[in-house]
Amino acid sequence: MALSEPILPSFATFASPCERGLQERWPRNEPEAGGTDEDLNNVLDFILSMGLDGLGAENPPEPPPQPPPPAFYYPEPGAPPPYSIPAASLGTELLRPDLDPPQGPALHGRFLLAPPGRLVKAEPPEVDGGGYGCAPGLAHGPRGLKLEGAPGATGACMRGPAGRPPPPPDTPPLSPDGPLRIPASGPRNPFPPPFGPGPSFGGPGPALHYGPPAPGAFGLFEDAAAAAAALGLAPPATRGLLTPPSSPLELLEAKPKRGRRSWPRKRAATHTCSYTNCGKTYTKSSHLKAHLRTHTGEKPYHCNWEGCGWKFARSDELTRHYRKHTGHRPFQCHLCDRAFSRSDHLALHMKRHM
């Protein structure tokens, strides 16, 4: 007897012996005979329309790859494993969407997996503060991530023991003479934020408030002097005070000081002639001795040139006289070729060129 339709192997052969044992162990509701035949016909029509005519018992269909389960996902206890009849399993696998929607945002390392429709923007990680204050990473969700379209989760602030605020930093002493510590006039931010507030595309971000700037160097010293006067202490040494530099005009007009004096210091004439009717004074004793020879007539310096018996009271006079015998003229005029044996004669000659 010829059959009008091709005979396909039974779908019961797709099930492995292990699945059969599990099906016998777990109780299930037996479907009605009419409903099962109708479901099988629908599945068969769907397979034929998809062009799976060569499907056999040896090559069961491979299910599409499933995405890895999100982090921190645990199956519900007490639920039986999803085993059913082979026909229903095959239909469910063919009619199941390719990818299951994610269950919710999950944290993988430094990235946040969020469901579609929510944008995730990565930002550079912030620098953690000290042991006190609110941790930046806890106050704004996971560190280095910014979730758009959703309000940021505010973390808990880490404080010191018994909820006390951190102690203010001590300022260094103004001078070695007095170790007076003056507290700052206003709150100061010990850790400036590494990044400024960026533009927000979702809701308004948390507002950042910065304290007033620290007082300048001049204001700090003025406050220190006022506080010392109020406490009855001596003001700090003037060497610690800072003064503004002078104007550029004063710097240009100021002339550098010379290392040596511009005029020689006038020496006191302490050597005085003791002869009557002579009150000459000299700064050097040698000069006074030469002057006394004029009163006594002593001439110790003699010219040794042959045939010359001149005598002189001073050595420089003998030197000039000796140049007459030798003809030596050390004083040369730089404007002409004339030379002189005495410096005073050269000075008189230079006046003629002027």
Curated annotation (Swiss-Prot):
<protein>
    <recommendedName>
        <fullName>Krueppel-like factor 2</fullName>
    </recommendedName>
</protein>
<dbReference type="GO" id="GO:0000122">
    <property type="term" value="P:negative regulation of transcription by RNA polymerase II"/>
</dbReference>
<dbReference type="GO" id="GO:0045893">
    <property type="term" value="P:positive regulation of DNA-templated transcription"/>
</dbReference>
<dbReference type="GO" id="GO:0071356">
    <property type="term" value="P:cellular response to tumor necrosis factor"/>
</dbReference>
<dbReference type="GO" id="GO:0060509">
    <property type="term" value="P:type I pneumocyte differentiation"/>
</dbReference>
<dbReference type="GO" id="GO:0043249">
    <property type="term" value="P:erythrocyte maturation"/>
</dbReference>
<dbReference type="InterPro" id="IPR013087">
    <property type="entry name" value="Znf_C2H2_type"/>
</dbReference>
<dbReference type="Pfam" id="PF00096">
    <property type="entry name" value="zf-C2H2"/>
</dbReference>
<feature type="compositionally biased region" description="Pro residues">
    <location>
        <begin position="163"/>
        <end position="176"/>
    </location>
</feature>
<dbReference type="GO" id="GO:0071409">
    <property type="term" value="P:cellular response to cycloheximide"/>
</dbReference>
<keyword id="KW-0805">Transcription regulation</keyword>
<keyword id="KW-0863">Zinc-finger</keyword>
<feature type="zinc finger region" description="C2H2-type 2">
    <location>
        <begin position="301"/>
        <end position="325"/>
    </location>
</feature>
<dbReference type="GO" id="GO:0071499">
    <property type="term" value="P:cellular response to laminar fluid shear stress"/>
</dbReference>
<dbReference type="GO" id="GO:1901653">
    <property type="term" value="P:cellular response to peptide"/>
</dbReference>
<keyword id="KW-0862">Zinc</keyword>
<feature type="zinc finger region" description="C2H2-type 3">
    <location>
        <begin position="331"/>
        <end position="353"/>
    </location>
</feature>
<feature type="region of interest" description="Disordered">
    <location>
        <begin position="52"/>
        <end position="111"/>
    </location>
</feature>
<dbReference type="GO" id="GO:0042311">
    <property type="term" value="P:vasodilation"/>
</dbReference>
<dbReference type="GO" id="GO:0035264">
    <property type="term" value="P:multicellular organism growth"/>
</dbReference>
<dbReference type="GO" id="GO:0051247">
    <property type="term" value="P:positive regulation of protein metabolic process"/>
</dbReference>
<dbReference type="GO" id="GO:0000785">
    <property type="term" value="C:chromatin"/>
</dbReference>
<dbReference type="GO" id="GO:0040029">
    <property type="term" value="P:epigenetic regulation of gene expression"/>
</dbReference>
<dbReference type="GO" id="GO:0048386">
    <property type="term" value="P:positive regulation of retinoic acid receptor signaling pathway"/>
</dbReference>
<feature type="modified residue" description="Phosphothreonine">
    <location>
        <position position="171"/>
    </location>
</feature>
<keyword id="KW-0010">Activator</keyword>
<feature type="region of interest" description="Disordered">
    <location>
        <begin position="145"/>
        <end position="208"/>
    </location>
</feature>
<dbReference type="GO" id="GO:0032715">
    <property type="term" value="P:negative regulation of interleukin-6 production"/>
</dbReference>
<dbReference type="InterPro" id="IPR036236">
    <property type="entry name" value="Znf_C2H2_sf"/>
</dbReference>
<dbReference type="GO" id="GO:0000981">
    <property type="term" value="F:DNA-binding transcription factor activity, RNA polymerase II-specific"/>
</dbReference>
<dbReference type="GO" id="GO:0034101">
    <property type="term" value="P:erythrocyte homeostasis"/>
</dbReference>
<dbReference type="GO" id="GO:0003700">
    <property type="term" value="F:DNA-binding transcription factor activity"/>
</dbReference>
<dbReference type="GO" id="GO:0000902">
    <property type="term" value="P:cell morphogenesis"/>
</dbReference>
<feature type="compositionally biased region" description="Low complexity">
    <location>
        <begin position="177"/>
        <end position="188"/>
    </location>
</feature>
<dbReference type="GO" id="GO:0045429">
    <property type="term" value="P:positive regulation of nitric oxide biosynthetic process"/>
</dbReference>
<feature type="modified residue" description="Phosphothreonine">
    <location>
        <position position="243"/>
    </location>
</feature>
<dbReference type="GO" id="GO:0045944">
    <property type="term" value="P:positive regulation of transcription by RNA polymerase II"/>
</dbReference>
<feature type="short sequence motif" description="9aaTAD">
    <location>
        <begin position="42"/>
        <end position="50"/>
    </location>
</feature>
<feature type="region of interest" description="Interaction with WWP1">
    <location>
        <begin position="110"/>
        <end position="267"/>
    </location>
</feature>
<feature type="zinc finger region" description="C2H2-type 1">
    <location>
        <begin position="271"/>
        <end position="295"/>
    </location>
</feature>
<dbReference type="GO" id="GO:0005634">
    <property type="term" value="C:nucleus"/>
</dbReference>
<feature type="modified residue" description="Phosphoserine">
    <location>
        <position position="246"/>
    </location>
</feature>
